[in-house]
Amino acid sequence: MEPGPSIAELFAHIHYVRLLFVFEDAPECARLVPDNEWSAEPDSDRMAQLLNESASAVRDAVKSRIASGQGMNMHYDHPILMLQQMIWHEGYHHGQIKLVLKMGGRAISDEEAGPLTWGVWMRKTGSEPRV
């Protein structure tokens, strides 16, 4: 079996795809798209910062196009469809990351992962995290 991408490469790919789709679909909100889709960032704090920046670009693109009533340029009939695609795309890679960790003997239980994923995604603004 051929080895798949590393966890760092998966995070780099997620960041890249976000920025590429913003560039193609709402260029007025575009940020610099990395040259290499799979180039791993060795500094985890820097990778987290990059992921936050690309998430902001997606948010700005969707929000801007909804506010203006304008569709996306290339891929989607409605801006919400871009957000939907990002959710399932990143959910797919979230599963890959959990599998890589498990195969490497570093499995994360649902009890450990829940507060860091579902607990963040489902938290209402201003509410305390569930532990």
Q: Which residues make up each language-model segment?
A:
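Short, contiguous alpha-helical
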Residues: 1-36, 73-131
